[in-house]
Design a protein with these regions (language model features):
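Alpha-helical interaction/dimerization surfaces of two-component signaling modules
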Residues: 22-26
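Acidic, metal-coordinating helix/loop segments flanking the phosphotransfer/catalytic sites
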Residues: 20, 35-54
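A generic structural motif
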Residues: 27-33, 77
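CheY-like receiver
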Residues: 44-45, 52-131
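Single conserved hydrophobic/aromatic residue that forms the stacking wall/gate
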Residues: 138-146
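Non-catalytic signal-transmission and effector/linker regions of two-component phosphorelay proteins
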Residues: 1-5
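Conserved acidic carboxylate
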Residues: 10
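Charged phosphotransfer/docking patches of two-component systems
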Residues: 13-17
């Protein structure tokens, strides 16, 4: 199985480190990166690096809000917003985030989010594999008809 790659974009270094430690304690086999805490630097990073499967994204960054980052970088990651502000929740779900964590983040709540990600990922893989088998069966049947 491939190692899950997760990234954190947070402009407050202590908060980024704490979230990193919390994720690693819950999923020590994951590769967790702390990315630059600005929109500009993070957009540049996304343009030249493979996107992580899961992105923990603070809404308020030093140079704007993270919705700008999403518009510019277009990450193909599943997104979890982390913020001290609850007024962005509706907008966060409008951009297909899988969760919205209010700071301070509690370990139990983070675990629920990680389990939601794992559940969604497993469902995607099951659906993809099912569709692949259907395509293979269809292709095989078509070849047999010739």
């Amino acid at each position: 199985m491939n190692k899950i790659k997760a990234a954190i974009i947070e402009d407050e270094v202590p908060a980024a480190r704490l979230l990193h430690e919390m994720i690693q304690s819950l999923r020590p086999d994951w590769e967790v990166m702390i990315l630059p805490g600005t929109i500009e630097e993070s957009v540049e990073w996304f343009h030249v690096n493979p996107h992580p499967e899961l992105l923990f994204l603070d809404i308020q960054l030093t140079d704007g809000n993270s919705f700008m980052l999403i518009e510019q970088a277009r990450p193909d990651s599943m997104i979890v917003f982390t913020t001290a502000y609850d007024e962005y929740a509706v907008r966060a779900f409008a951009v297909n985030s899988i969760d919205y964590l209010l700071k301070p983040i509690h370990q139990e709540r983070l675990l629920q989010t990680i389990e939601r990600f794992e559940s969604l990922t497993e469902k995607y893989i099951r659906d993809f594999n099912r569709e692949s088998r259907i395509c293979l069966l269809y292709t095989s049947d078509a070849a047999d008809d010739k």
